[in-house]
Amino acid sequence: VVAAGCYVQTKGDEAKCDEAIDILIGNNQKKELVERLDAFFAGRGEKVEAVVDINHEKQAFEELTLDHAAEHTRAFIKVQDGCNQFCSYCIIPYARGRVRSRNVQNVLEEVKRLAASGYQEVVLTGIHLSSYGIDCGESLLHLIQMVHQVEGIRRIRLGSLEPRIVTETFAEELAKMEKICPHF
């Protein structure tokens, strides 16, 4: 049994004690799943743990790229993870860690691969998409403008946005891009 993601990240001690769980994988180690499964079977069933405290260690964006998704024309591309808001009612910053933005070039490479595979629409997503770039000096608007230039992509959608990012300038710039699906 594999336990992965937010549960392990926020309830790691509880998960470690659960006899039914064989492999623990935190939110920033999902790419290591196959490696951890191999280690589990090579270790003759000994528990395998891959969890780091994502709130106290600087973490890079975990690249999980997509080349195709069944027989669809729309692809979801995660460009941001984590949150720095620490709202009193929310566990996300503890479960997902601080804001981490994906490198613009890596996003563009994935979008180009998807377009070459026949995808016509991309949805840019993130845990707190409005915070894209605050950790690396980029902006969500710049990323959207770059994705807009990719040949073969006909529609661009945005995951949920927080209202604070939707300034008059932001809305005006989006309105100039014919590939942006109407959100406002």
Question: Which residues are covered by each model-predicted region?
Answer:
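Conserved SAM/AdoMet-binding glycine-rich loop
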Residues: V1, T10-K11, A116-F184
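Proteins enriched for Cys/Gly/acidic motifs involved in redox and nucleic-acid/cofactor modification
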Residues: V1-S131, T169, F184
